[in-house]
């Protein structure tokens, strides 16, 4: 017995000693690495032949170091932190306009409802020519210059000099900067009598309230089916993805789980007690647990979008329609550095409820990782489902109906919709690269705003009207030729629909706001949306017996 105890004690000492030695070794390596970095910097500082920018060199070293880890661990320089946080926070401080720079002139497309500029009477079509008495016209104005001039501290004053048609003198407006919302739900509407549509562009702190407001409005209009559009949504906050999925899944269903080297497994479950009983815009949490649901995704849907679509697919709650998603299955956490810059470090992997890890491989380096989309295009993966490699080792089953789904590189939709490349003619690509549809429609509305508003009393009237008639298209082609793009009859035949659709949609956004883009674009050009609408209102979705 004593021998046995002694053996255990000896083993315990060896184990403890081994753990202690391992920890000391790890600490020694950390110290040596830090010393090495400092040593090289000091040698450069003491001996390099010319003066150099120390902070710039340090940032470059940090960027190179983080690049060796994974594509999503990176440094945000101090000067970029505010704009980066704006997307996550869902707001920024400014004057409240949507603008476009035309011929080196800052022109107001429209004012943001309730914002500082709207309150004092700034109008769509106004041209901002001075800021605090300084001319900003004809100085090769860039978007970054506009932000620098118009953004600032909440409550601070900026004086704008504005040129307005039919006014003889420059108008002066005192604007008090305020918090301006960045909408992550830019559009929602009834796509048919019983089917609602919600577009979500990212997962920000304001998204829960925006989503619930949209659901409440659509329910009040008789919505029985819902299309949730996550196309081109690159993600955002994990907590917001959890909230969104919770609106469609009933109690106690897992949404996602995460796990990392320093972070033990954490399960994220529907109907978290922190949200139970909360109301948003008159709708209680768990807002759409019953009813047909289709989720739209494509190759630019990533991260939080994949958490939501993966959870709803795994629980057989929704039909996922579109093309395979980006494949980002890593969780980042931000850490502020002493100089105000921020480093975002990957701390965990996330897994869908069925256990799928959907991060695509990145062992070939960052450049190869981000070229994967163009490689997928060249390999035909966007045009043909059969071109996508789906080995049996990546197969798993959904949790209720046992349908086959795949991990290992994005969420594979239940219904694949190929990308139509035929309409992307050589002529159209030139028009697109030069941004000619945007500039033409902007100028057209700027010159015809009053008559357009008189002709189309509301958006519904405009939506059902034929806008791109012969006279409109004649003006467009004259403009294109002036800008160096010649009309090609055969190319136009291929691209007619997309060109006319975008002209009509962009005119609408310039007359009203950006929410009006989607009803026009979806109904005429968005094939993933059209397939989703067909499926949700047809018999196919009923045959699947999804959990609705």
Model feature map: region roles:
Residues 305-308, 337-338, 351-371:
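Functional cores that coordinate and move charged inorganic groups
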Residues 39, 43-47, 51, 55, ...:
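Structured segments of extracytoplasmic/periplasmic soluble domains
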Residues 1-30:
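Bacterial Sec-dependent N-terminal signal peptides
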Residues 357-358, 362-548:
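Conserved functional hotspot residues or short segments at active or partner-binding sites
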Residues 45-109, 155-187, 256, 522-533, ...:
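Extended, small/polar residue-biased N-terminal targeting/export presequences
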Residues 22-33, 37, 41-54, 77, ...:
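Cleft-lining beta-strand/loop regions that shape enzyme active-site pockets
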């Amino acid at each position: 017995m004593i021998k046995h105890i002694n053996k255990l004690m000896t083993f315990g000492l060896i184990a403890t000693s081994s753990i202690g030695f391992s920890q000391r070794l790890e600490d020694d390596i950390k110290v040596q690495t830090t010393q090495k970095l400092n040593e090289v910097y000091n040698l450069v500082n003491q001996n390099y032949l010319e003066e150099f920018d120390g902070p710039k060199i340090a940032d470059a070293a940090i960027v190179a170091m983080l690049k060796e880890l994974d594509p999503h661990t990176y440094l945000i320089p101090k000067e970029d932190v505010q704009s980066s946080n704006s997307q996550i926070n869902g707001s920024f401080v400014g004057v409240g306009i949507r603008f476009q720079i035309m011929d080196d002139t800052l022109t107001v497309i429209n004012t943001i409802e309730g914002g500082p500029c709207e309150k004092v009477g700034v109008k769509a079509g106004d041209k901002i020519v001075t800021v605090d008495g300084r001319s900003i016209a004809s100085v090769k104005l860039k978007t970054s210059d506009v932000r620098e001039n118009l953004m600032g501290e909440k409550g601070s004053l900026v004086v704008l000099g504005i040129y307005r048609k039919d006014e003889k003198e420059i108008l002066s407006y005192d604007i008090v900067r305020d918090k301006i919302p960045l909408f992550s739900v830019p559009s929602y509407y009834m796509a048919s009598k019983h089917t609602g549509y919600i577009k979500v562009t990212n997962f920000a702190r304001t998204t829960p309230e925006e989503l619930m407001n949209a659901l409440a409005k659509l329910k009040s209009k008789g919505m029985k089916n819902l299309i949730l559009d996550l196309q081109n949504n690159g993600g955002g906050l994990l907590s917001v993805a959890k909230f969104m999925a919770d609106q469609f899944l009933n109690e106690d269903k897992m949404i996602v789980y995460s796990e990392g080297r320093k972070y033990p497994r954490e399960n994220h479950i529907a109907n978290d007690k922190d949200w139970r009983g909360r109301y948003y815009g008159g709708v209680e949490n768990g807002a759409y647990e019953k009813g047909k649901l289709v989720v739209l995704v494509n190759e630019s849907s990533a991260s939080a979008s994949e958490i939501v679509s993966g959870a709803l697919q795994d629980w057989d709650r929704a039909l996922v329609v579109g093309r395979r998603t980006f494949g980002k299955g890593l969780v980042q956490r931000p850490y502020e550095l002493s100089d105000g810059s921020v480093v975002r470090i990957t701390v965990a992997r996330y897994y869908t409820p069925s256990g799928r890890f959907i991060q695509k491989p990145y062992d070939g380096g960052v450049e190869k990782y981000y070229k994967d989309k163009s490689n997928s295009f060249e390999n035909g993966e966007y045009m043909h489902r059969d071109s996508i490699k789906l080995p049996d080792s990546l197969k798993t089953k959904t949790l209720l109906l046992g349908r086959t789904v795949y991990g290992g590189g994005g969420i594979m939709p239940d219904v694949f919709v190929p990308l139509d490349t035929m309409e992307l003619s050589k002529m159209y690509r030139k028009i697109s690269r030069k941004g000619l549809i945007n500039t033409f429609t902007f100028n057209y509305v700027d010159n015809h705003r009053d008559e357009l508003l008189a002709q189309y009393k509301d958006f519904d009237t405009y939506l059902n009207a034929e806008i791109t008639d012969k006279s409109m298209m004649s003006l467009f082609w004259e403009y294109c030729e002036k800008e160096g793009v010649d009309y090609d009859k055969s190319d136009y035949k291929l691209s007619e629909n997309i060109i006319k659709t975008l002209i009509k949609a962009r005119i609408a956004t310039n007359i009203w706001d950006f929410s009006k883009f989607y009803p026009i674009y979806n109904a005429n050009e968005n094939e993933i949306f059209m397939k989703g609408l067909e499926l949700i209102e047809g018999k196919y979705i009923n045959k699947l017996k999804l959990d609705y």
